[in-house]
Each structure stands twice: as structure tokens, then as C-alpha cells.
């Protein structure tokens, strides 16, 4: 099956940085980096699991992140060592860097969320010490995954898979930010009484699905099944997402913080943000903070989609 690849930004690092099907793959720079990822995530979840310091949604997220990253990194190492790239069900041009980008973002979020919403409320002692150490190893893992992305991303003039290009990596970032937005708007009371806010939620969902479909098409080498050329699909998707997010960046803050639309311009006006409630439920985020976070994340994703649109026009596609 012909594969759509891009000429513009990459070094195909899997072939140049590792020796396929050999134990020497672990002694190459990329192999050593993946060993560091494997060890740091393993130590992180082991430290937390040994003292049970992962109860509640924030602790569960951190534990999931470290276990998931450890498991997938182990699979990648096994495939590299066994020379099984041709038998892997997903595109090996696109899968490792896609995972590395997601893993870097996952570990970054855990390295921030876990200590700020969970560890600081633990009593001083062995449990807290283990949690702090786990956070440190999470930071190490984040840096290791980010380094892999920097090493394996596309370089100008080279041929590689789409996910190694700037637009491909931006797709990963866009879906990750959308997932964070979904976490903040998980309480329907934030939006279900105003059609404008419901539209914003629809925007987040539609753009997330479209970006996710793009990633899956590339991971499955299925870009040729589209009824339109893949470059046209990418440009249209980026333009549509920019237009949608442009409406959300106006409507969400307007209806959440403007008193003319029953919004709350000040944090003190939100009963869920009172100090007594925050003390009783330290791991929760009050409604006003959620609204502000979604506003900021909407702006961040809008910038990402604008960059995606600009970079997508600079890609040159070839068939191999």
C-alpha cells in the first residue's frame, strides 16, 4: 500500500539512530534514551505503589501515566531489539515519535498536577518522601521523552512520516490540550444552561475528533482511503479548526465572566471557590478556576491550530 509521507522536516531517526534487530540497539543514543524512559517511569510508579500514594483522581492519573508510558516504551524496545518493525500493526515511521510526544506531555502534566494537587496535602513521612521522589523521576521521564521528540522530529529537506513534522506534532499537542479541557468541563453545570457555551463544548469535541482521526489515519497508513487528497484534507481541517476555535475564544470568556450574560467576573463571586470548601476538598478545582483554565487553554489551542495551518501549507507530499 502506498504511504503518504512528507518532505520538509525530518530525520528518520529509527533507522539512523538504532541498529534494527540487534542488542546493539540499546547501546545507541536513542536506545539508551529509551532505557532511561523505561527506568524512570518504572521507578516513579513503583515508589508510589509501594506506599499507596495514588488514591483519588489526581493520584490515579499520575499512576496511569507512568504505567502506560512504561508499558509502551517496553513494547517499542522489544520491537527494536527483535527487528519486528515490519510486523508491527501501526506505521513505524509515525508511531514512536507520536507516542514520545504524548508521553512527554503526559509526564509533564503528572509532574505538575501530582505534586500541586496531591503531594502537598500529604503528611510528612515516608509516603510523602516516596511521592516527592516519584515526582522527580516523572520529571526525568518527561525530559527523556521530550529529548526523543527533539532528536527524531523532521528536518527540512528530508523525507519522513507525517507525525514527525511540525503539523503532526501539533496534532498531538492539540488533542492533548483538548483532553485537559474536557477534564475541566466535566461538570455539565459549567455550560449546559447556555447554548453559546454548549457550542464551545461542541467545538472542542469536533476539533478533537478531527485531529484524532488525522493521527489514526497516519498511524494506520490509511491516508489514501480519503476521498480527497491528504494535503487538501489537512489544510481544510486546520482552517475549519481555526474558525471554530476563533468563535470559542470569544464566546467562552464572554458568557463565563461577563455579568451581562450572568457570568462571574471575580473569583470571590463563586461560592465553590470559598476557602472552607477548598479545605474540605483540597483535590478539587472550583468552577471559576475551571472557567479560567478553559479560557486559557482555548487560546493556547487556537494558536496551535493557526501554527498548524501555516506549517501545513509548507509541506511537500510524496508517495513511496
UniProtKB/Swiss-Prot annotation:
GO cellular component annotations of the record: cell-cell junction; cortical actin cytoskeleton; membrane raft; plasma membrane; ruffle
Top-level taxon in the UniProt lineage: Eukaryota
InterPro entries, per the entry: Marvel (IPR008253), MYADM-like (IPR047123)
Bilayer disposition of the protein: Multi-pass membrane protein
Main localisation: membrane
Pfam hit, one: MARVEL
Domain MARVEL: 25-157, 162-317
Keyword annotations: Membrane, Repeat, Transmembrane, Transmembrane helix
Subcellular location: Membrane
Keyword Transport belongs to the record: no
One annotated GO biological process: negative regulation of heterotypic cell-cell adhesion
Transmembrane segments: 35-55, 61-81, 95-115, 131-151, 165-185, 197-217, 233-253, 292-312
Family: Belongs to the MAL family.
Protein name: Myeloid-associated differentiation marker
Species: Mus musculus (Mouse)
Amino acid at each position: 500500500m502506498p504511504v503518504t509521507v512528507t518532505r520538509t522536516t525530518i530525520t528518520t531517526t529509527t533507522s539512523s539512530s538504532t541498529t534494527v534487530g540487534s542488542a546493539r540497539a540499546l547501546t545507541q543514543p536513542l536506545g539508551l534514551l529509551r532505557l532511561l524512559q523505561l527506568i524512570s517511569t518504572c521507578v516513579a510508579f513503583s515508589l508510589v505503589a509501594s506506599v499507596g500514594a495514588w488514591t483519588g483522581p489526581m493520584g490515579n492519573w499520575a499512576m496511569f501515566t507512568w504505567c502506560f508510558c512504561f508499558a509502551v516504551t517496553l513494547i517499542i524496545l522489544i520491537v527494536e531489539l527483535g527487528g519486528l518493525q515490519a510486523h508491527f500493526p501501526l506505521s513505524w515511521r509515525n508511531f514512536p515519535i507520536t507516542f514520545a510526544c504524548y508521553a512527554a506531555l503526559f509526564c509533564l502534566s503528572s509532574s505538575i498536577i501530582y505534586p500541586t494537587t496531591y503531594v502537598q496535602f500529604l503528611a510528612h513521612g515516608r509516603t510523602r518522601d516516596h511521592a516527592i521522589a516519584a515526582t522527580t523521576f516523572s520529571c526525568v521521564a518527561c525530559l527523556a521523552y521530550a529529548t526523543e521528540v527533539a532528536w527524531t522530529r523532521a528536518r527540512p529537506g528530508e523525507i519522513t512520516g507525517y507525525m514527525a513534522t511540525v503539523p503532526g506534532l501539533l496534532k498531538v499537542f492539540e488533542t492533548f490540550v483538548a483532553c485537559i479541557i474536557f477534564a475541566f468541563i466535566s461538570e455539565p453545570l459549567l455550560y449546559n444552561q447556555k447554548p453559546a457555551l454548549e457550542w464551545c463544548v461542541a467545538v472542542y469535541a469536533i476539533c478533537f475528533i478531527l485531529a484524532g482521526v488525522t493521527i489514526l489515519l497516519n498511524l494506520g497508513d490509511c491516508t489514501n482511503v480519503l476521498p480527497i487528497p491528504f494535503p487538501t484534507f489537512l489544510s481544510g481541517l486546520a482552517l475549519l479548526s481555526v474558525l471554530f476555535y476563533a468563535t470559542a475564544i470569544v464566546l467562552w470568556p464572554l458568557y463565563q465572566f461577563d455579568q451581562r450574560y450572568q457570568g462571574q467576573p471575580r473569583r470571590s463571586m463563586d461560592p465553590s471557590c470559598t476557602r472552607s470548601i477548598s479545605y474540605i476538598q483540597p483535590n478539587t478545582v472550583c468552577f471559576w478556576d475551571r472557567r479560567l483554565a478553559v479560557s486559557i487553554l482555548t487560546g493556547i489551542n487556537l494558536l496551535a491550530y493557526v501554527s498548524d495551518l501555516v506549517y501545513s501549507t509548507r509541506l511537500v507530499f510524496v508517495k513511496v
